[in-house]
Amino acid sequence: MLIDTHAHVNFKAFENDFDEVIKRSLGEDVWMINVGSKYETSKKAVEIAQNYNNGVFAAIGLHPIHAQDEEFDKERYKKLALSGSEWSDKVVAIGEIGLDKFKDYGSFLKEQKEVFLKQLDLAKELNLPIIIHCRMAHEDLIKELRIKNYELRIRGVIHCFTGTWEEAKKYLDLGFYIGINGIIYKRDLKEVIKKAPLEKILIETDCPYLTPPQAESERNEPIFVRYIAKDIARIKGIDFKTVSQTTFQNAIDLFNL
């Protein structure tokens, strides 16, 4: 069993065949968490999760790059998470949320921080973990998390980690998991993968983006998360089964699946 802990089958790239993609993944024992980036994609993630008895879950949240063009309405997101008992066990995290200073996004970092802190409060209120997006903003993010972690006892994962081992260690010391995906084929993360405890690693695709080259496909899919697991096993010098079993259990533990 494998879990793609960060997928976007709820995005437009899958609008014509998301059911086929999901059934293909479930048929190969690959579960998934579809992650929202705005209210509409969050709603879509929940609606998709509703259609499956098991193996398909949702995360809801406002991505930092949208902090300027969409107002975060806490009550609206809360209602989305709690609308009916059949939904509440499908929404397993608040995300993806965080900070992004790439290109011009840093020009509204203040608004990003305000939205981020509001979503931390929502996660605490709903007793849900968070899925964090961080790009070129580790110092700012770690500072915010250290302040709020003491107050809120936040738990979660740093999605698509691209930082140094020193930065990874700071997140690990705060109790966070490290999310590893196809970015490993573009960035050298061998030191992070070698040194991070397997018990604190989650695997993901970020599909439809960051397709592993082995997949020989333009569009990434949850089923390709197996390539990430195989390369983690190779880098750590352990067997694939250990990686799949441990990261599966890690996801169960963090997201209470």
Which stretches of residues belong to each language-model region?
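Mid-domain alpha/beta scaffold segments of enzyme catalytic cores
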Residues: 1-257
